[in-house]
Amino acid sequence: MKNLIKTTLSAAAALLMLPILSFAEEAKSIYGEDNRLEYFAAAQDMKTLSDSVVSFWKATSIETLNPGGVKLKTVNFGDRLNLCPGEKFREQPIGAFCSGSLVGEDLVMTAGHCIKDDAGCAAARMVFGYAIKKEGGEAVTTMTASEVYSCAKIVKRFLGGEPDSANPTGQNLGADYALIKLDRKVTGHKPLAVNRGANLRKGDGITVIGHPVGLPLKVAGGATVRDFSKVGYFVADLDTFGGNSGSPVFNTRTKKIEGILVRGDEDFADSPAGCTTMATYEQTGGRGEDVTKISVLSASIPRLPGEKMAGEDGEDALEVRAMDSSALQAEVSAP
């Protein structure tokens, strides 16, 4: 089995061309048809979900503009990775290193390997709206400072191996997650709903929203659950890459979050022509992509107003709980 804890690129030469980028450590890939869509091309319900997805940036990659604006520092995807001509999204910018989702009024959920410690927390910025909003348009890389948030503290984090397994060193195949308290309450974006009910099953449809390779936001559906039996995570055939780490994975039917994209197969391959291509597999091929199950951390995510408690059946039996993540006990596990 390939080493799962690795940088986005499989080619050593490509790694040398990434001095300013720090992608998520777990690679991902394309299965069957490439289902990644731009924000503007997605269905309206997917756009609504996308508005609550964030990209993670280093503070040093965000330039302050006056008055009250910011500019994201990016590089050209194709040039930086020496992509072959014709590769999808080749001329777009890259710069984000992880993805995440708003699950409370000041609470973001991501992968545990995206924010490893207090130093990583202090250096990270969470940005809403990094996407291509109009057909023929360019990625939004200049925005108001109100769309940029800092990490105030790590509320809860876990990155560990699957219990009772004989995984090779470095292949932490268990759950991988972090809940991040922001420096202030989010305005203009709504927290997303998570599944607190029945588990997914093999064959259920799922969709991922995030920032593959640090690109502007992409929506990728057309995927299904391959194996839900793993401890702390499930396996799927999602079209994802490094940079997608931390992306929310939604139940295509219910539109609720079912998990967090955390790792997968090789992202890129060297072509005989000497350039880099995206790694592709048959729809049922490859090792699949791993998704932390939302059930392992849902108890630490505040309920949305009007959300039912487990076992409640009547329309009148609704509990409304304030979405204040400050009530959560900070718990930082060792990476």
Model regions: which residues?
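C-terminal cap/linker of serine protease catalytic domains
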Residues: 132-133, 139-142, 146-150, 185, ...
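Serine endopeptidase catalytic core focused on the charge-relay Asp
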Residues: 26-41, 48-89, 93-94, 103-105, ...
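Short beta->alpha transition motifs characteristic of CBS
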Residues: 111-115, 210-213, 242, 259-267
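Bacterial N-terminal signal peptides that target proteins for export
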Residues: 1-11
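Catalytic nucleophile loop of clan PA
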Residues: 101-102, 199, 240-262
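Boundary/junction segments of secreted and surface-exposed precursor proteins
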Residues: 25-49, 310, 317-327, 332
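Sec/Tat signal peptide C-region and signal peptidase I cleavage site
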Residues: 20-24
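Bacterial N-terminal signal peptides
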Residues: 10-19
